[in-house]
């Protein structure tokens, strides 16, 4: 168990307990300003403007959560998802990444760009391992103790060129993230079972220790256009083996964005 795992659980429980009295009807109360998600290098893009970088994309979400939204009290489910997303975001920022999107019970994050792809991949791997381990081995026992049904998590990641483009209208727009790497990372996350972390072929190619990888039974993915067929593999990442690096890596980074590191 890691110190980061304990912080993760504390963040979830603090938000879950502290927000119970914060329910308001929409439109009531003062409007407060909050910092939005996104990558600071691309926040200033104009409508239609696009730029790209090589980056590790990471997706984390809660498995079997749709069934929970069906059976359980809607406000309780919302509060639990919110609390876990807060902890997901904390892990990402502690490890120098950027939260690029929050949807329902899942998070999309980016790590980089940095000159050495192995750095982005290693840190994204540690972030995924930290979150999954924290839920399984630290948070869930504490939820059970409080009479709350445990949750399950999974992750997916890949690496490659990623485009940022501001899309929408002059009245309402946001920076959209597009590319094969983030798209395939999302597919990896969907291919993962509970407690699994699945990574794409290019991401896996930057993992030095091959014993950390196990070929996924559904690999490779086939892509066909006209008369040409190509394949792209994906693997299970043995995330438990990387937990030994979590606390020291967080201490070393101290929340500094990876792109600001001098390596």
Task: Map each language-model feature to its residues.
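Catalytic core of nucleotidyl cyclases, primarily class III adenylyl/guanylyl cyclases
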Residues: 95-120, 140-178
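Active-site/pore-lining binding-face segments in mid-to-C-terminal subdomains
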Residues: 149-215
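Intrinsically disordered, glycine/charged-rich C-terminal tails and inter-domain linkers
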Residues: 1-41, 194-263
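Acidic, metal/cofactor-coordinating or nucleic-acid-engaging core segments within structured domains
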Residues: 125, 129, 133-145, 258
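Substrate-engagement module of ASCE P-loop NTPases
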Residues: 84-90, 130-135, 184-190
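A general structural signal for alpha-helical elements within enzymatic catalytic domains
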Residues: 89, 93, 136-140, 144, ...
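Short acidic-hydrophobic sequence patches enriched in Asp/Glu that either
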Residues: 123, 127, 177-180
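Catalytic NTP-binding/metal-coordinating core of nucleotidyl cyclase/transferase enzymes
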Residues: 44-123
